[in-house]
Amino acid sequence: MKFALFPNTCAKAGKPVFEAFRKSLRYHQVWLCENTDLVPVDVGVMWSVLTNMYGRKPIYDYYKTKVILEVGGLKRNQTWKVAINGINRDAYFGNTDVDDSRWKQFNFDLKDWRKNGDHIIVCGQNPNSEAWDLPDISAWWKNVITEIRKVSDRKIILRPHPRSPVNFKITDSNVEIQQPKFVGEYDKFNFEESLQNAWAVV
C-alpha cells in the first residue's frame, strides 16, 4: 500500500508516535508530505481531528481512507490511539476481537464505588474538539447543574477543559469553578487532588 504521512499536523508530544508509525510502514511505500502536498495514495496519515481543523481539513477531505493518530484516553502521553477515519466514537479501532492483554498492561487497580464524599466533580470538554458534539458548552454546564440539583444538594465543582474555561455566571452558591492547574509535566494537571473526597464524577 501507499501512505502519505503529514508529520506537521502533529502535536509536540506526538512526534515520537508519528515517527514510530512511519517505521512500522517499512514494507510499504511512504511519502512524507507538507500539509499542502496532497499525494494520490491509498491512505493519508495525520494527527488528530479538531472541529476547526487548524489547516488539516484539506488532508482529511482528500483521502477516502485515513489513519488518525491521537493522544490516548488513559495514561495521557504514555498511550496513544491509532484509528481509521476518525477519533473516539467516529473511528474504527480494529478492536472487535481482542483479548484483555492490553488492558492488563495499564496495571490499574479498580476500586469499589464510593458511598460517601463531599462534592461532585463535573468535567468539561473543549468545544473545539471532535470529542464534543453537543450544543453550546455553557448551556451544557447549566443543564448539568440543574440535573444534579434534582438528586443532590452536595457541592458541585465544575472543572473545565484546560483550554476552555467556564464563561458564564454561576448563580448557585454551592457551585465552584476549579480551573485545572498545571503540575509541571507536559499536559499534566492536578485532577488527582480534586478526586480526594469526591462523591462522584460526571
What is each stretch, according to the model?
Residues 33-61, 65-70, 202:
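Short, well-ordered secondary-structure micro-motifs within conserved domains or adaptor modules
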Residues 5-10, 142-188:
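Catalytic donor nucleotide-activated moiety binding site of glycosyltransferases and closely related
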Residues 14-20, 53, 136-147:
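Well-ordered, non-membrane alpha-helical segments in soluble/globular domains
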